[in-house]
Amino acid sequence: MAVPTIPSPACISQSANGSIISTRRSTETNPRQHPSTSYRCAGRVVRRQGRSAISRSGSRYLHDLEAGRSLLKRVTLRRDWDSRLDEKDQYPRLGARAAATFEAKPENAEKDYSKNGKAANKGVDNGKDRLAKVPISNIRNFSIIAHIDHGKSTLADKLLQTTGTVLAREMKEQFLDNMDLERERGITIKLQAARMRYVDETGEAYCLNLIDTPGHVDFSYEVSRSLAACEGALLVVDASQGVEAQTLANVYLALESNLEIIPVLNKIDLPGADPERVRREIEEIIGLDCSEAILCSAKEGVGIPEILNAVVKKIPPPKDTAAEPLRALIFDSYYDSYRGVVVYFRVMDGRVKKGDYVQFMNSKTEYQVDEVGVLSPIQMPVNELYAGEVGYLSASIKSVADARVGDTITTVSRKAAQALPGYQLATPMVFCGLFPIDADQFVELREALEKLQLNDAALQFEPETSSAMGFGFRCGFLGLLHMEIVQERLEREYGLDLITTAPSVVYRVHCTDGTITECSNPSALPDAGKRKSIEEPYVRIELLTPKDYIGPLMELAQERRGEFKEMKFITENRASLVYMLPLGEMVGDFFDQLKSRSKGYASMEYSVKGYRESKLVKLDIRINDEAVDPLAVIVHQDKAYSVGRALTQQLKKLIPRQLFKIPIQACIGSKVIASENIAAMRKDVLAKCYGGDISRKKKLLKKQAEGKKRMKSLGRVDVPQDAFMAILRLEKEVV
């Protein structure tokens, strides 16, 4: 249906100064009689005093008169708000949001009116100040060392807020922890860096670069590279809990890098805080002078100015080596869908700018730099970065494998003579199989792993096929936490339902023909006749515990084939236990048992120390005379019987009964060491026989026995998914 033409549409007329003169409406057509009639309205507000004009759509069709009136009302309100914004002194509570919404005059835009009417001048100018260059003598690069839950993220938040790097209205808890998993677990997984501008009491401006570090032992290599990019570190210790195991591990890494360490006693506001006791602990255990340790409460903001002053006065500036060939240390990287891999680095020597051709010295790949900038903590592009500065670069890099943590960046035109020391390839230590519950999700699982690998060069995976589980992947991880994080991200971010096999470690198998092979999958272990010996990785584990739990923890270590090395009392009430332990004994529930037996008070840290020969055997689980590969495990010879007995008994409870008897066996080679049987369901074939000749009954029973025999030879026992999941959980506990 055609829309009637309106010779004289409703409109808005304006004078030169923007005021509304009149409105005209057509009287030739009654809009109430013609609902489909459209009124055309055009509105324009001309801003006075040099402000830019705001123009609404020149033509806008409205389907009734009320809508036209509504538009006219909005235009009038817009005009009224603009006039009110000119009188900012009379309306101090409009705030930054109102000023941005109604586009206040340019001379007012740089003032951020807070809720209490006071101007906060740490808005637009602060970003410009952070980009301003300072002498290299005024640069400080530092990190924060702390155990889990000792307040590292809270302290970082306060430093960002106190220096004005992040405005109060933008602040949130754990600002540098972007992943949901990091917030939920209270740990740092992906590194972050933040550039802060700090002005001391004399008015001198400093550039402070905070390089965050992950706190878990799985990422100890990343921690070492982050510390290598700094000249100092804040040692944060909970004033109520004292020194923990992970604190010691990271402090030793910092001392190896010759960093200036500033002790900070956090959480002094807690009722159980005892700063004097913790000072003595630090001096006795680590050997640091804590007479000038800073008392701090990051939550309440106590001691933050003292920490900033200590960073400026005690941590030395970087060396002025800007004239030398470029050498930059990569301490983190991540994959961006649009720019490729974005590299976080510290310039150790030389300069780098946009357009330079750079080479990653260990991977031997070359790229042209598309963008360089600083992290404040958002990415802010700059023209150039020189020695001592921390920033990022993007160069259309397609894989994080080309820009690994610890690699050295140099320019193609003027290459450095040698790379920075300390580079290592991240080597997976723990392996497990990942299988989708729904076989149709195999392709989705592969795509999800490929996406995760773009951000995580340490993650390795390869296809794996199982007769019982179908198609899946054998994945390698840095440690148990790394494995848990990847599994949880696959399930949460990609919506996958997964079955995970029992975790295993990498074994070295010496074969009879003189070759040495590495095996991470128990089902791929060579036959016993081809094996000469098997080596397994060992770790040095240090346990810090109150003296009341020394006995239970020593029992736990001995149960896991631990070799006692040392015990010492670090204080009157706390002791340190050192053991050499097989890594395979830790990948189960060792940490859970540690916390359970110590009531949560003990902490641990470990480091891999090499391989040792052990008496290991492959334990196969056979169901109805068929080996089930995902249930195979490598165990010590002394534990094989108990593990086999536990697995067969559990499977007997979980597998449903069939019309034929199902044998469940735990085998070492061809030798059965444990066995259980699931009895067959009985079908009463004699129910219709009410008497008569016994030969009829014998004939029916014989026919039933032949059918069961044929069914057993041809039948297939499907282990249900919940049984698999339960038995795999049991494997993680008993292995």
From Swiss-Prot:
Q: Which Gene3D superfamilies match?
A: 3.30.70.240, Elongation factor 4, C-terminal domain (3.30.70.2570), Elongation Factor G (Translational Gtpase), domain 3 (3.30.70.870), P-loop containing nucleotide triphosphate hydrolases (3.40.50.300), Translation factors (2.40.30.10)
**SMART domains found in the cross-reference section:** EFG_C
Biased composition regions of type Basic and acidic residues, renumbered to the chain: 106-115
One of the record's GO cellular component terms: chloroplast
Q: Where is this region: Disordered?
A: 1-38, 106-126
tr-type G domain residues are 137-319
The record lists GTP as bound by: 146-153, 212-216, 266-269
As its record notes, the protein acts as a catalyst of: GTP + H2O = GDP + phosphate + H(+)
**EC number(s) per entry:** 3.6.5.-
Q: Which UniProt keywords apply?
A: Chloroplast, GTP-binding, Hydrolase, Nucleotide-binding, Plastid, Protein biosynthesis, Transit peptide
SUPFAM superfamilies named among the record's database cross-references: EF-G C-terminal domain-like, P-loop containing nucleoside triphosphate hydrolases, Translation proteins
Q: Which GO terms describe its molecular function?
A: GTP binding; GTPase activity; ribosome binding
Query: Is the keyword Glycoprotein in the record?
Result: no
Stretch forming the transit peptide: 1-47
Q: Where is the composition biased (Polar residues)?
A: 11-38
- Keyword 4Fe-4S applies: no
Question: Where does it primarily localize?
Answer: plastid
Gene Ontology BP annotations: positive regulation of translation; translation
Cysteines paired by S-S bonds: none
Locations listed in the record? Plastid, Chloroplast
Q: Which InterPro entries match?
A: EF-4, EFG_III/V, EFG_V-like, EFTu-like_2, G_TR_CS, GUFP, LepA_C_sf, LepA_CTD
Give the protein's function.
Answer: Promotes chloroplast protein synthesis. May act as a fidelity factor of the translation reaction, by catalyzing a one-codon backward translocation of tRNAs on improperly translocated ribosomes.
Q: Which family does it belong to?
A: Belongs to the TRAFAC class translation factor GTPase superfamily. Classic translation factor GTPase family. LepA subfamily.
- Which PANTHER family does the entry mention? TRANSLATION FACTOR GUF1 HOMOLOG, CHLOROPLASTIC, TRANSLATION FACTOR GUF1-RELATED
Name by which UniProt lists this protein: Translation factor GUF1 homolog, chloroplastic
Organism field: Physcomitrium patens (Spreading-leaved earth moss)
